[in-house]
Regions:
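Mobile cap/lid helix-loop segments that gate and shape the active-site cleft of serine hydrolases
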Residues: 29-31, 36, 41, 151-153, ...
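Short beta-strand element of the alpha/beta-hydrolase
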Residues: 59-68
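Short amphipathic alpha-helix adjacent to the substrate-entry channel of hydrolases
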Residues: 76-95
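Primarily recognizes the serine-hydrolase "nucleophile elbow" in alpha/beta-hydrolase
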Residues: 116-189
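Short beta-strand/loop motif that positions the catalytic acidic residue
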Residues: 230-232, 236
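Conserved alpha/beta-hydrolase "acid-adjacent" motif
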Residues: 237-243
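Catalytic histidine-centered segment of alpha/beta-hydrolase-like enzymes
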Residues: 266-276
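Catalytic active-site module of serine/aspartate enzymes centered on a nucleophile-bearing elbow/loop
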Residues: 276-294
Length: 294
C-alpha cells in the first residue's frame, strides 16, 4: 500500500496547479463567466474552456492549464473565482483550459489540444476584449510541461486551412511553469521509479516512444521561444529539480528569456507560505512584465 507521503505526492502531481496561487473567497467586483466554450472536438466529444472576465479587464489573458499527470478534470468555473482570485484582482481575463484527458488520451494528445486552445482564444479574442498578443499560460506539474511546450513550439496559423481555428497562431507571450517535467525521453518504456510508483501515471505515457523528443520542451528551445519562468522545489522527488535546471541551461544557449526560481525545501508542491511569499509574487511579476500593454 502506498505511504501517506507518496499519496500526497501523487495528489499534487495529478491535481497540478489547483492550489498554486493563494486566494480568498470573492473577487473585488463580479466577474462574468463564459462556461464550456467548445474549442474543438475529439472522438465525438467536445474540448472545452471557460473564460472568466473581471469587471475591469486589462486586455491580457492567462490560460490556466487544468492538467495534473496529464489528467484534465472538469470543475465548476465558479470555483475559479476562488482559485483564480489573484488573477482577477489584477484584471487579467482567466481562461480555464481542459484537454483530452488520461487515461483515454496520452501526452501528445494533450499537447495538440492546448495548442488548439491557444489558436481558438486568438480567433475569439475580440469577442472577449482580449489582446491576442498578450496571452500568458500557467500550469503546474503536467500543466507546467504543457506550458513549456506552448512557449517553445508556437507556430503561425495556416491561412489556407478550412478549419478557421487553425488559421490562427499558437504563439504565446509568456509562460509560468511550476515543477515541470521538461525531458520525457525514456518515459514510455523506462520511466523514473517515482513515476512507476504511481499507477495512474502509466496511461498518459502509453504512446509511441518515437514521439518522446517531440513532447520534450527542453529540445525545442529557440531564440523565438516565449519568456519562461520556472518555479521548482529542490526537494522534489517526483519531478526532480534537474528538469528545470537543464531547461534553464538550454534557454541560456539562446537569446530567449528564461528564469528559474528554486524554492528551498519544497517538494512537488508548495506550502501556503511559499505560495504567498514566492510563487505568487514571482508569477505576477513575470506576467506583469511580459503581458503589459505595448
Amino acid at each position: 500500500m502506498a505511504s501517506p507521503s507518496r499519496l500526497l505526492v501523487a495528489c499534487l502531481f495529478l491535481c497540478g496547479s489547483w492550489a498554486a496561487i493563494p486566494s480568498v473567497l470573492h473577487a473585488e467586483e463580479p466577474a462574468k463567466i463564459h462556461a464550456d466554450l467548445v474549442y474543438g472536438h475529439k472522438d465525438g466529444m467536445a474540448l472545452t474552456l471557460d473564460i472568466i472576465q473581471p469587471a475591469k479587464a486589462n486586455g491580457a489573458a492567462v490560460l490556466w492549464l487544468q492538467s495534473g499527470g496529464w489528467y484534465s478534470s472538469w470543475t465548476e468555473p465558479e470555483n475559479f473565482l476562488i482559485a483564480g482570485k489573484a488573477y482577477l484582482d489584477q484584471h487579467y481575463t482567466l481562461i480555464i483550459v481542459r484537454h483530452g484527458s488520461a487515461p483515454r488520451y496520452q501526452v501528445p494528445d494533450a499537447v495538440a489540444d492546448v495548442r488548439r486552445a491557444v489558436r481558438y482564444v486568438r480567433w475569439k479574442a475580440k469577442d472577449y476584449g482580449i489582446d491576442p498578443e498578450r496571452l500568458g499560460v500557467f500550469g503546474g506539474s503536467a500543466g507546467g510541461h504543457l506550458t513549456l511546450m506552448l512557449a517553445t513550439t508556437g507556430e503561425e496559423g495556416d491561412a489556407s486551412s478550412k478549419d478557421e481555428v487553425l488559421r490562427h497562431s499558437s504563439r504565446i507571450a509568456a509562460g509560468v511553469a511550476l515543477y515541470p517535467p521538461t525531458d520525457l525521453r525514456g518515459f514510455v518504456k523506462t520511466p523514473p521509479q517515482a513515476i512507476r510508483d504511481i499507477p495512474a501515471l502509466k496511461p498518459p505515457l502509453q504512446f509511441d516512444e518515437a514521439l518522446e523528443p517531440s513532447v520534450s520542451p527542453i529540445l525545442h528551445v529557440t531564440d523565438a521561444s516565449a519568456p519562461m519562468l520556472m518555479i521548482h522545489g529542490d526537494k522534489d522527488e517526483l519531478v526532480p529539480l534537474w528538469h528545470s535546471t537543464n531547461m534553464e541551461a538550454a534557454i541560456q544557449k539562446t537569446t530567449a528569456i528564461g528564469k528559474l526560481v528554486v524554492v528551498k525545501g519544497a517538494a512537488h508542491g508548495y506550502s501556503p507560505e511559499q505560495q504567498a511569499e514566492i510563487v505568487g509574487p514571482e508569477t505576477f511579476a513575470w506576467f506583469g512584465e511580459y503581458l503589459k500593454a505595448k
